[in-house]
Amino acid sequence: DSMAYKKVMAAAFAVTLFLAGCAGSTDKGTSPAAVPLKETMNPISVRQLVAADNEHNRTIMFQLLKSVEEFVEYREKGNDRIFSVPAKGAVLKGNNGITDSYIYTSELRDLKKGAAYEYRTRTGNTVSSWMDFRTDDGGAFKTVIYPDSQSADYTGWSKLAAKAYELNKDAAFFVSMGDLVDNGQDEYQWQAWMRSMKGIMDTIPG
């Protein structure tokens, strides 16, 4: 009859809404459904750090001039599934013309061994460009070893560092020995050193 028909249709509509809701959900730790993103974020001094287990983990650090809710997103190359990890922030005092900033740290875990990944930073709907990293495959590896780099002007050091990496793009990580800067309490010198390592320390860990 008419009443029975209405009940059946209402039940069918409810099931349809339930299934639609399930289809729109995301796994824990993954980024939310696609929203318009602005690739205008410019984090400062992005770097990768050697982890206790380079086959499955990677630590990402970067700086911003303000305190915000920050995330690092990453995905395996060739895979559209994006994972999101919160980044912990802490105040970093500046000096010598460098303003105070916030340094953020995010640990990426349970990565695939010997796999190519890309990562980016995110605040709200603003993201940085994608940057690359690769996990250790457990086999033989190459490293770039840099000597004492402290100096008053890092122009020459920047050229040396870039050339060494250009000739060893297959390096798994880099090591900087000796004094990295002339005054370890001077944030200005640290920023100068890290600018000279851009394109290196954001691609391989050190």
Predicted segments with their positions:
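Short, Lys/Arg-enriched N-terminal segments with co-localized hydrophobic residues
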Residues: 1-2
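Active-site neighborhood of divalent metal-dependent phosphoester/pyrophosphate hydrolases
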Residues: 138-206
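Sec-dependent N-terminal signal peptides of Gram-positive bacterial secreted proteins and lipoproteins
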Residues: 7-25
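Acidic, histidine-bearing metal-coordination/catalytic regions of metal-dependent phosphoesterases
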Residues: 20-145
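Generic secretory/membrane-interface signal
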Residues: 10, 126, 173-176
